[in-house]
A protein has these predicted regions:
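Transmembrane alpha-helical segments of polytopic membrane transport and secretion proteins
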Residues: 1-29, 90-94, 186, 266-303, ...
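Membrane-water interface segments at the C-terminal ends of transmembrane alpha-helices
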Residues: 19-50, 56-168, 196-223, 248-267, ...
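Conserved MFS/SLC helix-loop-helix module at the cytosolic interface between two early adjacent transmembrane helices
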Residues: 89, 93-94, 173-176, 180
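Glycine-rich helix-loop "coupling/hinge" segments at transmembrane-helix boundaries
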Residues: 119, 217-243, 470-498
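Membrane-helix/interface signature in polytopic inner-membrane proteins
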Residues: 164-175, 185, 419-430
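The alpha-helix within a helix-turn-helix
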Residues: 178-179, 432-434
């Protein structure tokens, strides 16, 4: 096969150009996303111009935002290194299940995680009861340490998975050679493991840092006063307590600049993770077979599992006892959340499919879908509020705007997964389909959708679960009649009805996991082609 001038095989370039799927859905989706994101940004920027310069409290919120994100990233990555190393060195029953559970906090509703952390680390939690029994003073969870604790709970599994992938990328033959040379664990760390860590750690830390900059719900529930206020929480307070739209716009611009800078840096620090070729054998670590190191790794894995699973167990335990305490508003809010989640899922997959089919021929189109990574949902919500407020009561649009923003926030994940699979389908089957004259709807129905079904199911489950637990834009727009389940839980916590909040938290956890399981299983069932 003769290469084309750009160095790619001619048949592959031809297939990429001749997918025979229309361009107009992708163009409309791109224009829609530009209007949805750039319009609110323009509104925020224009309003901020008349809102004056940031005051001392705004700079304090900026400093706290950066401080908690830095601490969260450093602690998460520092703890993830020994946990990932222990998982890389050991094989034990349930290891695969444990690694799978490391992904659970990603789809766990934030408000549910907060309830679990309060049950363990709060004033009446298990830890403080134990300290009181030992005659030691209680610990406080509210403030900087509470925010950092919650962020470590969410991001320790993510950092562990990322670093574990780096360990698994080291060829097993290198560890075999190290064992034949009699290398000690310290020498293996210095020669084999440290070069990998030096490559992987900066990217992992920056991703965690960027995620912690936009964690609104954690700061709202565990912030603990003006000294522990993030920029997003300050935006919320400017709306709900002062209704100072000018100051909210100024804060939104500060948040926008900070998040874009962090996202750009995280994307730039994306080093290659290849550490040489091998035969893809399972790693065996002869240098780590001493009783001391085996015990050390077992303790690390056990502590990490307890830290992650104990709050979830506490949610189930306390929630089961509080199910009968839930008011009728909780069930109404659950129905509202389900509707918002399903609408967001349909919107997200529709946009992702439209953009992915166009990105096959025009790769730059993928950038439209990735804009959601760099923009805080509260910034978009602020801009939409400024746009619609002169014409209509924003509370009337609360649920629709929430579903729309949730879809945009989940779009980068769905688009990336769908596009990668779509490229593989076209490169593998596209040439034959084109020769058979399969175009348009026929090609989509018989070639693409059956092979995309598992990815579509996983993407739908992820979007539905994330939307179900979102507590962001709805907090800006909603009134007493339009509350989602996370917002209703927050209101119950504010009224000190913790038993009812625990029951509602268990309901939210069950619904989120059920949505993810139903969509993911629906995508995998009968999907073999």
């Amino acid at each position: 096969m003769q290469p084309s001038p750009n160095g790619k095989p001619r048949w592959r370039a031809s297939v990429t150009r001749r997918t025979s799927l229309p361009d107009w859905p992708g163009l409309l989706a791109g224009l829609f996303l530009c209007a949805l994101i750039l319009g609110p940004l323009a509104a925020v920027t224009l309003r901020a111009g008349g809102g004056g310069w940031p005051v001392a409290a705004d700079w304090a919120a900026l400093r706290f935002t950066v401080l908690q994100a830095v601490l969260s990233a450093v602690i998460s990555v520092a703890l993830a290194v020994p946990v990932a190393r222990a998982l890389a060195r050991r094989r034990f029953p349930g290891r695969g299940v444990l690694i799978t559970l490391l992904g659970a906090p990603f789809i766990l509703p934030v408000i549910v995680a907060v309830l679990g952390l309060l049950a363990v680390f709060g004033r009446g939690g298990v830890l403080n009861d134990a300290l009181l029994w030992l005659g030691l003073p209680r610990v406080q969870i509210y403030g900087l340490h509470g925010v950092v604790l919650a962020h470590v709970f969410f991001n320790l599994p993510l950092a562990t998975r990322m670093i574990l992938q780096g360990w698994q990328a080291i060829p097993a033959e290198r560890f075999r050679l190290a064992a034949s040379l009699g290398m000690s664990p310290g020498t293996v760390l210095r020669i084999l493991e440290w070069p990998m860590l030096r490559t992987v750690l900066p990217g992992a830390a920056l991703i965690v840092f960027a995620l912690c900059l936009s964690s609104f719900a954690v700061a709202l529930t565990l912030g603990g006063g003006p000294r522990a206020t993030t920029l997003e929480l300050a935006i919320y307070q400017a709306f709900h307590f002062d209704f100072d739209l000018g100051r909210a716009a100024v804060l939104a611009v500060m948040q926008l600049v900070l998040v874009i800078a962090a996202a750009a840096l995280a994307l730039r620090v994306n080093p290659a993770t290849g550490f040489g070729a091998g035969l893809d054998r399972i790693q065996r670590r002869w240098e780590a077979e001493t009783p001391l190191l085996r015990t050390q790794d077992a303790v690390l894995i056990l502590l990490a599992a307890l830290f992650l699973l104990t709050p979830l167990a506490a949610v189930v335990w306390h929630g089961a006892a509080g199910l009968m305490e839930m008011p009728a508003q909780v069930w109404n809010a659950a129905a509202v959340s389900l509707a918002v989640s399903l609408v967001a899922t349909v919107l997200c997959l529709s946009l992702a499919m439209a953009l992915a089919t166009l990105a096959l021929r025009r790769p730059w189109v993928e950038g439209f879908g990735l804009m959601g990574i760099a923009i805080s949902p509260l910034v978009i919500g602020t801009g939409l509020f400024l746009i619609v407020n002169p014409w209509v009561d924003p509370a009337r649009l609360a649920l629709g705007v929430t579903a729309l923003v949730n879809a945009v926030m989940a779009l980068p994940f769905a688009l990336r997964m769908i596009l990668l699979r779509l490229r593989e389908i076209e490169e593998t089957h596209g040439r034959l389909a084109t020769s058979l004259g399969m175009t348009g709807g026929v090609r989509l129905r018989w070639l693409i959708l059956p092979r995309l079904r598992p990815v579509l199911g996983f993407s739908a489950g992820l979007t539905a679960a994330l939307s179900m637990g979102d507590l962001g834009v709805i907090a800006l727009f909603a009134d007493m009649e339009n509350a989602t389940l996370p917002l209703q839980i927050l209101r119950l916590m504010g009224a000190y009805r913790m038993d009812a909040a625990a029951g509602a938290g268990l309901l939210l956890l069950a619904l989120s996991l059920a949505l993810f399981w139903v969509f993911d299983k629906g995508g995998r069932d009968n999907a073999s082609v």
